[in-house]
A protein has these predicted regions:
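Structural motif
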Residues: 1-24
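Flexible loop/turn connectors
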Residues: 18-115
C-alpha cells in the first residue's frame, strides 16, 4: 500500500522496488499510479535505484509537466465533474432518483515518463 503524498509514496515505492530487485520477480512492464503525487514519488525512487520503467499518473497536476521526466497522466475536466456531481446531488435529494451512471471524458497527456 502506497501513501498518497509525494514523500510517503517515494519511501513506500522505494521499499517496494528494493524488494522487487532483491527477489526473483521480474520488473513490471509499466506502472500506473492512482494519482500524480504517487507517480512523482515513484519517479524519484526509480531514479535513485536506476530503474527505468514507464509510469503514468492521474489528475494532471501542475507539477506533472515540471518533473524529470515529465509525467504522462490522465486529465479529467474537474470543473465539469464538480458541476455534474452537484447537479446529481440536488436531483437525488429533490426527486429521490435512483443511481445513474455518468461517464466523464478524459484525455491522456503523453509526456516523457512513458517514452
Amino acid at each position: 500500500f502506497v501513501q498518497p503524498t509525494i514523500d510517503d509514496s517515494y519511501r513506500d515505492f522505494k521499499d517496494y522496488l528494493v524488494e522487487l530487485i532483491k527477489g526473483e520477480d521480474e520488473m513490471p512492464d509499466a506502472f500506473a499510479a492512482v494519482n500524480d503525487y504517487i507517480a512523482l514519488g515513484a519517479i524519484r525512487a526509480m531514479q535513485e535505484l536506476n530503474v527505468n520503467v514507464p509510469i503514468t499518473g492521474f489528475d494532471d497536476i501542475s507539477f506533472a509537466s515540471y518533473s524529470t521526466p515529465s509525467l504522462t497522466t490522465v486529465r479529467v475536466n474537474k470543473r465539469y465533474l464538480g458541476e455534474v456531481a452537484v447537479k446529481r446531488l440536488i436531483e437525488k435529494f429533490s426527486e429521490n432518483e435512483n443511481t445513474l451512471k455518468i461517464m466523464v471524458s478524459t484525455e491522456i497527456i503523453e509526456r516523457d515518463s512513458t517514452k
